[in-house]
Design a protein with these regions (language model features):
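Extracellular interaction modules
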Residues: 18-24, 121-123, 134-136
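Exposed extracellular interaction/assembly regions and N-terminal maturation sites
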Residues: 1-9, 16-103
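Sequence/structural signature of small/polar-enriched beta-strand/turn repeats
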Residues: 45-47, 120, 144
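Short, surface-exposed terminal/edge motifs of secreted or surface/virion proteins that either
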Residues: 30-39, 99-108, 113, 126-146, ...
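Small-residue hinge/turn detector
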Residues: 154-158
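Tight coil/turn sites that cap or link beta-strands
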Residues: 86-88, 120-124
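Extracellular/luminal recognition modules and glycoprotein regions
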Residues: 118, 151-152
Length: 170
């Protein structure tokens, strides 16, 4: 029996397999887990059409298996960035492209939901790839923030990233 791989490329070795090389493979897996949990990569996208984010089984360096992704390049039409159907993960994705066109993040197949940056939106989104259904998986944007809670007698951290409170608060 041979190794299997997760949707993000982590090798799942079978007992007794890879005699003499399991240490190297385990170290690669640990590096891959580190990349998945907090890595950063700049991913060039195609000017038009689709840009797939692929996994590289048993290797580091794949944009798909990186937590923070900055999309780069000049786009000359609306584009999509897609991921394989078996991926469940969350990402911080920045639209660092130039060109006034939309960027849509979606699964490669299926009819589930997706997340789209408008033609003028060059911001960062927190995106959850649910992988909840093999035919209609959802990709959703996680909205963080909102109006601050509390009163003017409490210290508040608001959605602009500033602290607020009453002038007489001591």
């Amino acid at each position: 029996m041979t190794s299997a791989y997760t949707g993000l490329g982590v090798e799942l070795m079978v007992t007794g397999e890879n005699s003499g090389t399991w240490g190297d493979k385990t170290n690669t897996n640990l590096n891959l887990l580190e990349q998945i949990s907090g890595g950063y990569i700049e991913q060039a996208v195609n000017g038009t059409g689709a840009t797939p984010l692929a996994v590289i089984d048993g290797n580091t360096g794949a944009a798909l298996a990186t937590r923070n992704i900055k999309l780069t390049g000049t786009i000359t039409g609306n584009i999509t960035v897609n991921i394989p159907i078996d991926v469940e993960n969350f990402y911080f994705i920045e639209n660092g492209t130039s060109g006034a066109y939309t960027v849509e993040f979606e699964y490669v197949t299926g009819s589930g939901s997706s997340v789209t940056w408008s033609a003028t939106d060059k911001g960062t989104k927190i995106i959850l790839a649910k992988g909840n259904d093999v035919t209609n998986p959802d990709i959703v944007e996680s909205v963080v923030g909102g109006l601050p809670g509390g009163s003017n007698t409490q210290v508040q951290f608001n959605n602009s990233g500033a602290f607020g409170g009453d002038a007489d608060l001591i």
